[in-house]
Every structure is written in structure tokens, then in C-alpha cells.
């Protein structure tokens, strides 16, 4: 097959767009902030098809299962994996902050901090308890779940729908075939929308640099550097070890999903690459049923980057305000963060709201301390989203391997670049 010219390759276009966005934001900030609708529009186009794709993928995957106990088994294994890896992420964030101490030397008096700037985040954080979160998974109506784009609600509907179709067997085949055909159409739409990724990445990056400025990074470069370094270590060491035991290279896996990662980098939203990630995981040999269950669930329950960020941010605020936390208080922080992180989604700003929820339950550290990192949170959001999407991709491959539903030949060929993986191919075929 004839190789594409480099300027027609999507990830090259996205890289170029990000660079142009940074330049525009730095030299022409007023004009750059007007580019925000380009990024927002691209994310909305992707979110437009996320719900239907999750529904169709999960329904056809479950409907094709001969053993309905498998649904619970896959879900149980996924949740077990999520909890174990999330704990590693939380502990790594805590350890890195203790080791590198990015907050030491600020010597800030908590009484001088103005919490008005973060009041809206605190209000959102207080607005939902664990019970509310669980009840929110049940939609008011099926239509409402799709209209609001609530991933967990759509997943619940799909689980019920697919289970009934599996029970009906041949009598439900007409519906299953229709949904399978609809899946092909939806991924075709994703292929069209993905071509607009460079425009979306340009708009989002130009707005970020134009609004916040590169200069806002300087005072807190140590915290940003610590977070990025810790996330890289997590991916290469923790996820890399898991990948090695599963039989694949984390470096090759990251290279395989580079286009999705660049879209996430440009938009700061891991949701922006969800449909493409699901399709690529199927192309790499993961079964449709596992992809359909693990990836959407992971967007609420397996946010590794957010977990690293939370323990690091809390400890940074404590160091900056000279507040000493006992080991018992830090263990409490880990337990609280494990719970509050489950309500985070893959959209920009969700990590900051989750941080507010964590601080609200740990009264030793003032909530107003969040103002210290408010200005740089947008720059840390990219790293959170990148780590989250890699973590969910690895989780899907691992659970597929546990279920013995991983085609290792496809995985090997995909990671080596021997398979022509294009969005126009039909998922699950």
C-alpha cells in the first residue's frame, strides 16, 4: 500500500496545529482566546456519538455472549483491576510529593488566601454524595440518558438491553443485526469528525495559552514538573510492568494510540478520543464485549492520572502552607481520594472538582488552598487526561487477556504496525 505523505498523517497535522496554537496564544492572546469555539465544537462533535457508540458496542457484545455470567465476571475483574491500579497511582503521587517536595519554600499563611476564586468548584464538590452518585447512575428516562450524555447511565441501559437480546436468542437477531449495522455507521461518523481534530486541537491550545499565558507556569514549574514526571514513571513502570506480564510493550502500545493521545493533548479531554480508542482496541485483538464494558466504566472508575494528581495536589497545598500531615491523616486522604475519584469524568475541569471534594472531607487542609494551583490546573489537565486514556487502554487489554479473549496475533501485528488500522474498518469484525 502506498505510504501517505507525512503532511496527510493525522498525528502530524495535530502536532502542527498544537504548535501553531501555542504560538498564536503567546503572541496574540486576544485573538487566541477567540479560538475557543473551535476546540469546544470538536469536543461536542465527538461527544455527540459517544453515547450511541457505547450503547451499540455493549449491546452487540453482550447479545453475542452465550454465558450471561460472563458479564458479571468481566465487570468484577475490571473493578478489581481498577482498584489495585488506582491504589498504586495514589501511593505514587504521595511518594513523589514527599520525595521531591514541590510545595516547600512557599511559606503561605492560609489566612491570606482568598477562597472566592474556587467557591464554584467547592459548591459542585459538596453537591453530590456517594449515594447521590450511585442513584445518578439510574436515569430518569432512557432518552434523558442519551440527551445528557451520561456514560454510566447509557452503560446501564445497554447492559439491560443486551441481556434481554441474549435471552431472546434468534428472536432478537433482527434487532441485534440492526444495532450492529448502526455501529458501522457511527464509526463512519467518527472517521469524518476525526479529520477535524487538528482544528479542534489548534483552537483549544490557542485558547489555553492565550487565556492563562506561559508566564503563569513559572512560579509553579516544580509542581508541574513533578506531576508530569510522576505520570511518566507511572506509565512506564507501573503500567509497563503490567503490560510486560500480559505480553506486550507499553512503549509500542503508546505509539499505537499516538493519534488518540495527541487529540487528548490538544483538547485536554480524554472523552475526545473515546470512540477512536474503543475501535483501535478491537483492532488490536480485544473482544468487543470486553471493550464495551471496560472502557466506558474506566472513564469513571479508572482515572489513574486524576488519582496521581489528587494526592500530589493535596500534599503540595499542605507543604506550601506549612501544614504537617500525620501518616494516619495521609492514609485517610488515600481512602477519601479512592472514593471521590470515582465521580470524576473525562472532561476538562473534572479533576479540579474532584480535588475540592477530597479537601472538603480532609478538614486539616484549607479548601482555599486550591487557589494556589487554580492558575496552572489547565496545564496539568493535559497530563491527567493522557495518563487516564493510556491506563484505560492497558486495562482493556489486561481484562481481555484474563478472559482469554485477546487475539495475541492481532495485538502483536497492531503494535508492530503490520495491520492497516483505519477508522473506516468495521469495529468488531
From Swiss-Prot:
Localization per record: Cell inner membrane
Main localization category: membrane
GO-annotated cellular components: plasma membrane
Gene Ontology BP term (one): L-aspartate transmembrane transport
Keywords noted in UniProt: Cell inner membrane, Cell membrane, Membrane, Symport, Transmembrane, Transmembrane helix, Transport
Record PROSITE patterns: NA_DICARBOXYL_SYMP_1 (PS00713), NA_DICARBOXYL_SYMP_2 (PS00714)
One Pfam family here: SDF
Family classification: Belongs to the dicarboxylate/amino acid:cation symporter (DAACS) (TC 2.A.23) family.
PANTHER family hit by this protein: AEROBIC C4-DICARBOXYLATE TRANSPORT PROTEIN, PROTON/GLUTAMATE-ASPARTATE SYMPORTER
Protein name: C4-dicarboxylate transport protein
Lineage: Bacteria, Pseudomonadati, Pseudomonadota, Betaproteobacteria, Burkholderiales
Name of the gene encoding the protein in the UniProt record: dctA
Amino acid at each position: 500500500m502506498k505510504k501517505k505523505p507525512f503532511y496527510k498523517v493525522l498525528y502530524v497535522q495535530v502536532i502542527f496545529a498544537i504548535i501553531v496554537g501555542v504560538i498564536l496564544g503567546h503572541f496574540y492572546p486576544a485573538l487566541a482566546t477567540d479560538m475557543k469555539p473551535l476546540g469546544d465544537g470538536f469536543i461536542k462533535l465527538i461527544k455527540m456519538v459517544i453515547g450511541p457508540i457505547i450503547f451499540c458496542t455493549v449491546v452487540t457484545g453482550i447479545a453475542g455472549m452465550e454465558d450471561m455470567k460472563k458479564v458479571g465476571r468481566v465487570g468484577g475483574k475490571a473493578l478489581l483491576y481498577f482498584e489495585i491500579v488506582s491504589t498504586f497511582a495514589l501511593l505514587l503521587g504521595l511518594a513523589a510529593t514527599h520525595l521531591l517536595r514541590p510545595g516547600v519554600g512557599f511559606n503561605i499563611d492560609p489566612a491570606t488566601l482568598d477562597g472566592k476564586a474556587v467557591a464554584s468548584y467547592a459548591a459542585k464538590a459538596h453537591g453530590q454524595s456517594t449515594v447521590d452518585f450511585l442513584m445518578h447512575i439510574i436515569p430518569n428516562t432512557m432518552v434523558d440518558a442519551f440527551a445528557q450524555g451520561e456514560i454510566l447511565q447509557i452503560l446501564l441501559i445497554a447492559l439491560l438491553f443486551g441481556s434481554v437480546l441474549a435471552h431472546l436468542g434468534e428472536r432478537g437477531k433482527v434487532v441485534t443485526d440492526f444495532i450492529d449495522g448502526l455501529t458501522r455507521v457511527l464509526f463512519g461518523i467518527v472517521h469524518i469528525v476525526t479529520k477535524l481534530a487538528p482544528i479542534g486541537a489548534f483552537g483549544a491550545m490557542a485558547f489555553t495559552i492565550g487565556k492563562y499565558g506561559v508566564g503563569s507556569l513559572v512560579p509553579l514549574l516544580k509542581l508541574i514538573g513533578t506531576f508530569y514526571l510522576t505520570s511518566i514513571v507511572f506509565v512506564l513502570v507501573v503500567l509497563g510492568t503490567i503490560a510486560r506480564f500480559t505480553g506486550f510493550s507499553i512503549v509500542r502500545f503508546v505509539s499505537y494510540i499516538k493519534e488518540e493521545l495527541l487529540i487528548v493533548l490538544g483538547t485536554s479531554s480524554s472523552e475526545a478520543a473515546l470512540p477512536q480508542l474503543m475501535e483501535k482496541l478491537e483492532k488490536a485483538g480485544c473482544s468487543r464485549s470486553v471493550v464495551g464494558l471496560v472502557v466506558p466504566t474506566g472513564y469513571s472508575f479508572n482515572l489513574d492520572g486524576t488519582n496521581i494528581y489528587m494526592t500530589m495536589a493535596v500534599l503540595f497545598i499542605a507543604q506550601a502552607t506549612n501544614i504537617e500531615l500525620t501518616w494516619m491523616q495521609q492514609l485517610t486522604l488515600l481512602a477519601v481520594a479512592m472514593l471521590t475519584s470515582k465521580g470524576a469524568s473525562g472532561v476538562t475541569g473534572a479533576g479540579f472538582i474532584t480535588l475540592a471534594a477530597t479537601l472538603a472531607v480532609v478538614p486539616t487542609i484549607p479548601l482555599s488552598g486550591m487557589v494556589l494551583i487554580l492558575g496552572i490546573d489547565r496545564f496539568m489537565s493535559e497530563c491527567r487526561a493522557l495518563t487516564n486514556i493510556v491506563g484505560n487502554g492497558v486495562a482493556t487489554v489486561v481484562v481481555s487477556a484474563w478472559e482469554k479473549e485477546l487475539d495475541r496475533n492481532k495485538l502483536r501485528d497492531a503494535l508492530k504496525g503490520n495491520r492497516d488500522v483505519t477508522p473506516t474498518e468495521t469495529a468488531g469484525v
